[in-house]
């Protein structure tokens, strides 16, 4: 995929509040400045719904990485951190995987991780992670809401943050899908 806008044209947000972990994604698939689909599912669950994955970037590349992560999760008995590190090593060292244009947020009860195309595994300090073109908008909104709106649930914060991101990012929309880590 040669168009950089298509690479980052989405919003994925994950946050943890009061032991509740929510991951949310918009539904828009864009290529350049064209909307191809508005109801895409960018979230997947694995390990009996104990791990949720959201991806941004090329859809095919995101699905390929999801499949690789699923294999690692099975290989390492649902140990998310170990599986993510092993996937990142493969991603960095494999000639084919290095060309994949995608990022992922993965979460279980213990960890929220961002996996980048450079082979990075990043665990955010404040229990909020976001990727994609609308990621910084969603991240900023979630941080503000977490700080000043103590009465909101994780799900309410995620929905409000995603809607703010969709208002500001032309490559994201208001068709928000959310999953809760069980």
UniProtKB/Swiss-Prot annotation:
<comment type="function">
    <text>Protease subunit of a proteasome-like degradation complex believed to be a general protein degrading machinery.</text>
</comment>
<protein>
    <recommendedName>
        <fullName>ATP-dependent protease subunit HslV</fullName>
        <ecNumber>3.4.25.2</ecNumber>
    </recommendedName>
</protein>
<keyword id="KW-0963">Cytoplasm</keyword>
<dbReference type="InterPro" id="IPR023333">
    <property type="entry name" value="Proteasome_suB-type"/>
</dbReference>
<keyword id="KW-0888">Threonine protease</keyword>
<comment type="subunit">
    <text>A double ring-shaped homohexamer of HslV is capped on each side by a ring-shaped HslU homohexamer. The assembly of the HslU/HslV complex is dependent on binding of ATP.</text>
</comment>
<dbReference type="InterPro" id="IPR029055">
    <property type="entry name" value="Ntn_hydrolases_N"/>
</dbReference>
<dbReference type="GO" id="GO:0009376">
    <property type="term" value="C:HslUV protease complex"/>
</dbReference>
<feature type="binding site">
    <location>
        <position position="166"/>
    </location>
    <ligand>
        <name>Na(+)</name>
    </ligand>
</feature>
<dbReference type="GO" id="GO:0004298">
    <property type="term" value="F:threonine-type endopeptidase activity"/>
</dbReference>
<comment type="similarity">
    <text>Belongs to the peptidase T1B family. HslV subfamily.</text>
</comment>
<dbReference type="Pfam" id="PF00227">
    <property type="entry name" value="Proteasome"/>
</dbReference>
<feature type="binding site">
    <location>
        <position position="169"/>
    </location>
    <ligand>
        <name>Na(+)</name>
    </ligand>
</feature>
<dbReference type="InterPro" id="IPR001353">
    <property type="entry name" value="Proteasome_sua/b"/>
</dbReference>
<keyword id="KW-0378">Hydrolase</keyword>
<dbReference type="GO" id="GO:0046872">
    <property type="term" value="F:metal ion binding"/>
</dbReference>
<feature type="active site">
    <location>
        <position position="10"/>
    </location>
</feature>
<keyword id="KW-0645">Protease</keyword>
<keyword id="KW-0915">Sodium</keyword>
<dbReference type="GO" id="GO:0005839">
    <property type="term" value="C:proteasome core complex"/>
</dbReference>
<dbReference type="InterPro" id="IPR022281">
    <property type="entry name" value="ATP-dep_Prtase_HsIV_su"/>
</dbReference>
<feature type="binding site">
    <location>
        <position position="172"/>
    </location>
    <ligand>
        <name>Na(+)</name>
    </ligand>
</feature>
<keyword id="KW-0021">Allosteric enzyme</keyword>
<keyword id="KW-0479">Metal-binding</keyword>
<dbReference type="GO" id="GO:0051603">
    <property type="term" value="P:proteolysis involved in protein catabolic process"/>
</dbReference>
